[in-house]
Amino acid sequence: MKKVIHTDDAPKAIGTYSQAVLADKFLFISGQIGLDPTTMELVEGFEEETIQVFRNISAICKEAGCSINDVIKFNVLLTDLSNFQKVNEIMEKVLEKPYPARAAYEVSALPK
């Protein structure tokens, strides 16, 4: 059985998807970009966008009854892999050890 997770503290879905779906004990969170949930606009600057992504994920986790520190894997998509170290620094600030598994990819563009 699956349960759709939605919170007003994260950006509403802008396509044919849910913010997250809880299936048994697993929470599947849709990809996030640095959208402010109140304005639905991207925040400015790479670091602020990244921090906003983690705020959005945290809000979704909270709505599902868990914490961002319960996440077991992140897939990080970057349009410029030179920002990878900044992502590491931000993750170190917002996550507790032990850190989750992670994969990072450089992509040509991200949707909005």
What is the meaning of each model-derived region?
Residues 1-112:
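Short, polar/acidic, helix-capping and beta-turn segments at strand->helix junctions
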